[in-house]
Curated annotation (Swiss-Prot):
Gene3D superfamilies, sorted: MazG-like
Organism, scientific name: Rhizobium etli (strain CIAT 652)
SUPFAM superfamilies, A to Z: all-alpha NTP pyrophosphatases
The reaction(s) this protein catalyses: 1-(5-phospho-beta-D-ribosyl)-ATP + H2O = 1-(5-phospho-beta-D-ribosyl)-5'-AMP + diphosphate + H(+)
Name of this chain's protein: Phosphoribosyl-ATP pyrophosphatase
Single GO biological process annotation from the record: L-histidine biosynthetic process
Lineage of source species: Bacteria, Pseudomonadati, Pseudomonadota, Alphaproteobacteria, Hyphomicrobiales
Top-level enzyme category: hydrolase
HAMAP family xrefs: HisE
Keywords: Amino-acid biosynthesis, ATP-binding, Cytoplasm, Histidine biosynthesis, Hydrolase, Nucleotide-binding
Similarity comment: Belongs to the PRA-PH family.
Length: 107
């Protein structure tokens, strides 16, 4: 198993976002703003869904990587650190998913 983590990818996205948009796809996405980055995330998510629905494991792996990357770009633009997302996941996993969902609906 690889030692590469989402935190590693977040650091790379941060570094590359500071480059020239002519030199870095990440910088180009960031310079294009949230609407462009969010649209690209949506496109990649649809491609991942299609790969999952057709049982194409190799393509699903590829598209899942794209989704994670583009999600981190969207989070970068929104100035939401991955740590915040992980804390939310940790909070949610402290109880069953059904209970957590019921609590959200009653709020």
């Amino acid at each position: 198993m690889s030692g590469f983590s989402l935190a590693d990818l977040e650091r790379i996205v941060d570094e590359r976002s500071k480059a020239s948009p002519e030199q870095s796809w990440t910088a180009k996405l960031v310079a294009g703003g949230q609407p462009k980055a969010a649209k690209k995330l949506g496109e990649e998510a649809i491609e991942a869904v299609m790969a999952a629905a057709t049982g194409d494991r190799d393509n699903l792996t590829y598209e899942a990587a794209d989704v994670l990357y583009h999600l981190l770009v969207v989070l970068k633009i929104a100035e939401i650190p991955l740590e915040n997302v992980m804390a939310e996941l940790e909070r949610r996993t402290a109880q069953s998913g059904l209970k957590e969902k019921a609590n959200r609906q009653s709020s």
